[in-house]
């Protein structure tokens, strides 16, 4: 990439390492992605939990928050108001790589016609299996997110063959419902 892209990556890594040291998450990375809403100059870092600065401005947005929805569901045909989605590939506290997808006018301006950004998913699929349920919050796909964020009332039936992610989606749905409806459920 360009010198600006290299500087941006270095800045991201330095900030993430400093914050991770403060939060002590063990081997799990706090931040796994970022979305840039179109035309606003804003950036939202998406992570396992929400973190705010002293002024209560979000530093990391919880993956279950409504503002994080485009991270999982934006497509080339329906960018959901974002111009960039960025996946961070990490191992523990080490940033291994950054995978960008650009949408809308930004994609046209960069001359990019090809949809990119499947690197994080492919890496997760190719990772060795341990027999334990994996941590997939960074690689939830749009169809899975629709099930996870489905309205609460009524019965929700999730069907699929062995190994298609039914249990993982159900567990993330439970986490989403507890996050979104925590006060009515108390």
Language-model-detected regions and their locations in the chain:
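N-terminal accessory nucleic-acid engagement/regulatory domains that precede
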Residues: 1-123
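P-loop NTPase Walker
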Residues: 91, 124-186
């Amino acid at each position: 990439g360009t010198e600006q892209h290299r500087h941006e990556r270095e800045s991201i890594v330095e900030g993430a390492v400093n914050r991770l040291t403060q939060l002590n998450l063990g081997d799990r990375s706090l931040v796994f992605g970022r979305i840039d809403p179109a035309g606003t100059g804003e950036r939202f870092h998406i992570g396992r939990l929400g973190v705010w600065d002293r002024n209560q401005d979000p530093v990391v947005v919880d993956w279950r928050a409504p503002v994080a929805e485009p991270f999982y569901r934006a497509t080339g045909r329906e960018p959901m108001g974002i111009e960039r989605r960025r996946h961070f590939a990490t191992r523990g506290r080490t940033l291994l790589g950054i995978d960008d997808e650009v949408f809308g006018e930004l994609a046209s301006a960069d001359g990019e016609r090809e949809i990119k950004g499947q690197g994080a998913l492919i890496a997760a699929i190719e990772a060795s299996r341990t027999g334990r349920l994996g941590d997939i919050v960074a690689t939830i796909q749009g169809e899975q997110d629709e099930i996870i964020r489905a309205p609460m009332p009524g019965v929700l039936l999730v069907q699929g063959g062995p190994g298609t992610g039914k249990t993982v989606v159900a567990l993330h749905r439970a986490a989403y419902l507890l996050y979104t409806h925590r006060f009515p459920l108390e």
